[in-house]
Amino acid sequence: MKHKLFVVAALVMLQASPFIPSMIIAQQPTAPFRSYQQARRVLDDAIAAHGGVEALRAIKDFTLTEKGKVYARYQSPTAEQPFAIGTSEETLIVDTDRGLVLDDLKTANTGFNNWIKTVIKGTEGQTFDMWSKTETPIPNASVNNFRGQIRRLPPIVLLEALDRASTLRWLGEDAIGGKKQKVISVLRPDNQLLTLSIDAQTNLLTRYGYLYADPVTGDSEIAQTYSGYRTLGKLMLPKGRVLYNSGGVIQETEYTDLQINTRPADSVFVGPAGFEKLSAPPATPPPPAVTKIADDVYILEGLNGGTHNVLFVAFNDHVLVVEAPEQILYNNNSVQALAKIKATVPGKPIKYLVLTHHHSDHAGGFREYVAEGTTIVTTTETKSFLEKAAAAESSLLPKLASKQLNIETLENKKRVFQDDKHLVEVYDVGPNPHAKEILVVYLPKEKILFQADLLNAAPNGTFAIAQDPTISFSEKLQQLGLNVERIYAVHGRAATPEELRTSIEKRRASDLK
């Protein structure tokens, strides 16, 4: 009872005393709350500068045509800079109100010339290969499939941030191109922490991006910048964009035409007629799995979300592995691969790793093999690439036990591995439009060839027309005189020499010259 009376008396004194500051009684704003408030002011100012929230939310459809350059960072024919420069042309029409998308994209670089049209209507969609004249259904089609492309308009980025306002935080000030920026962050629904840089003078969005672990450059940022804003109705919209990745520019484009709320006719969202109809790929890629394709020869399929495969051979006292794929956003693919390999061939050390070429998605997973004490066998171009990648300082990538890599390169464009039961031959079939030096792995007894990027068969059983790298690959196979019955690939399913020839015949009969 005495305790209760004491508490009541204390409350009365607090309320009555004129000498106790009100701030003691009021809840103090916490650091996260203050950070949110400052970030929210920056975002609100940016939305106002771009036309105001009402005008931004009134965007129901847009038509964007852009033209520019693409830079093949760590995907060029050689490992050294400058990177190969290609071209891109794209028309993107999006009607979010009606769930409609038309994307017409042409790109050309490193021997590949692609022309793809995509049409989405609600939950149905098709991809049209304009050179091969094939039509493929899109599983789980939605306007959100093009969310990344839709963000080419800054108002979309700002509205997404507003819709996640409780996650806004103030990060500080920065400078881009000599101009002061106010920098805030927001957490997207996919848990990606996005950073927005707002011009301190104009309040226009300069840049947005996020940090990630790059298998080549280490700690990096994927970012998109906007410039040359212009007025379109009530809106402020950019004249172009620059996309950054792996420590540098990978695309520069000019917005040659941009229209808002024209309500395109339904007839716009119709693909070409008369194309060969193919079956849809699986809606969800199957998990990585090992298949025995010959005695002591295995293919591990389904890495990188179903896009990459690995070959491995169990010799008498060791294992030879071909390829160490890794995503641009480092995802421990070699950890998965090693676990599968060791479960399939327990007790044998992984002595050799053959890397076909220096591109990041094929060689970026080398670190885990270095930790195993594996000797890497590859080309001089890839050796240079690996040494630079190993030297990259990173707090996000796995630490290398030693930056002294054990790398052996081919002599006279050939290397042979063998014991009394197994024979594996490695050939450099470069120069190729895709890579100056590029290896294929041949198993003479099994009549199996394993290659990367030179012949890509889609899972649904079809072949696109041959691109320049495929034509060069076919010519080199004829010169080598290898007796091949099955062609396995880093990308896609196994193929036959007959399918390779058919792919080349399609190219000769196509409009792509």
Report residues per predicted region.
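C-terminal segment of classical bacterial N-terminal signal peptides
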Residues: 14-24
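Gly/Pro-enriched, hydrophobic low-complexity segments
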Residues: 26, 177-273, 439-444, 451-452, ...
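Flexible, processing/modification-adjacent segments and terminal tails
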Residues: 28, 33-41, 48, 119-194, ...
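N-terminal mature ectodomain segment of secretory-pathway/periplasmic proteins
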Residues: 34, 41-134, 167-172, 328
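Conserved beta-strand hairpin/beta-sheet module of binuclear metal-dependent hydrolase folds
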Residues: 291-341, 438-457
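Divalent-metal (often Zn2+) His-rich catalytic cores of metallo-beta-lactamase-fold enzymes
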Residues: 474-513
